A protein has these predicted regions:
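C-terminal motif of bacterial Sec signal peptides marking the signal peptidase cleavage site
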Residues: 8-11
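N-terminal Sec/ER secretory leader and immediately downstream segment
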Residues: 13-118
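Long, compositionally biased low-complexity regions that are usually intrinsically disordered
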Residues: 13-17, 215-228
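Mature extracellular/secreted ectodomains of secretory-pathway proteins
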Residues: 69-202, 209-212, 216-220
Length: 228
């Protein structure tokens, strides 16, 4: 199971263009303290962050007014504020909110800030909470598979809200897929990948630690996020 998962996640990694030389990865002494499972977790987390960045890019493209709300001039500056190496611990303009509360701002009619940033930062911090706030993992690190399972369910709820939540004038807070027939399904694909990665990771961690995942049945339309 672990080997198959590692192979699947590696296959998801972006490949260099043909004209780009393949560079050997430098040896890192810290890798000695990593198990195969730790490497799977790190790959999964990095890939999830890439998907969130891609989701943010697409949402800004469909909702350019949110760039102006965030006082950004380009997609790149907005994305760097969310994901760049110099990003702030608390994203500005979200009233200090994060995780589920930040996602809630994206669909709050009284919020006049950048709704794309609120939605993405909420997902990003929720993701990091499920991975115990770490981006490197070692043999002694043990994740909670229940948190990862709840993360997948929370992503389902967040994407349901993205597709359905409207303001008092019946307008979507954020435009994602086209409202017309044959619309762009790229948002649906990204949502499916993000949810699927967390479900897969929850199972891998549960199997590796002999822990059971409690499946909680809840209607997505109840829009109550699970605590992580």
């Amino acid at each position: 199971m672990l080997v198959a998962t590692l192979a699947l996640l590696v296959a998801c990694q972006p490949r260099p263009a043909r004209h780009e030389p393949v560079q050997a990865q430098e040896f890192d002494i810290s890798a000695v303290a990593k198990s195969d499972g730790d490497m799977v977790v790190e790959i999964n987390l990095r890939q999830s962050q890439r998907y969130l960045r891609e989701l943010a890019r697409k949402l800004y493209a469909r909702n350019p007014n949110q760039l102006r709300r965030g006082r950004y001039t380009t997609h790149d500056t907005a994305l760097n504020a969310l994901f760049g190496p110099r990003r702030l611990t608390h994203y500005p303009g979200l009233r200090g909110k994060r995780s589920a509360q930040a996602i809630g701002l994206a669909f709050d009619e009284d919020f006049h800030g950048d709704r794309v940033a609120a939605f993405i930062e909420g997902l990003r911090t929720m993701l990091m909470d499920a991975y115990d706030g770490k981006d490197s993992f070692y043999i002694y690190d043990v994740l909670d598979p229940q948190k990862l399972h709840y993360l997948a369910r929370n992503f389902e709820i967040a994407f349901w809200k993205l597709r359905h939540d409207r303001d008092s004038e019946d307008r979507l807070f954020l435009v994602s897929n086209s409202l017309y027939g044959g619309g762009n399904l790229s948002f649906e694909r990204l949502a499916g990948k993000l949810i699927g990665l967390q479900d897969l990771m929850a199972k891998v961690v549960a199997d590796g630690s002999n822990r059971q995942i409690k499946n909680v049945i809840q209607r997505v339309t109840s829009v109550v996020f699970f605590p992580i």
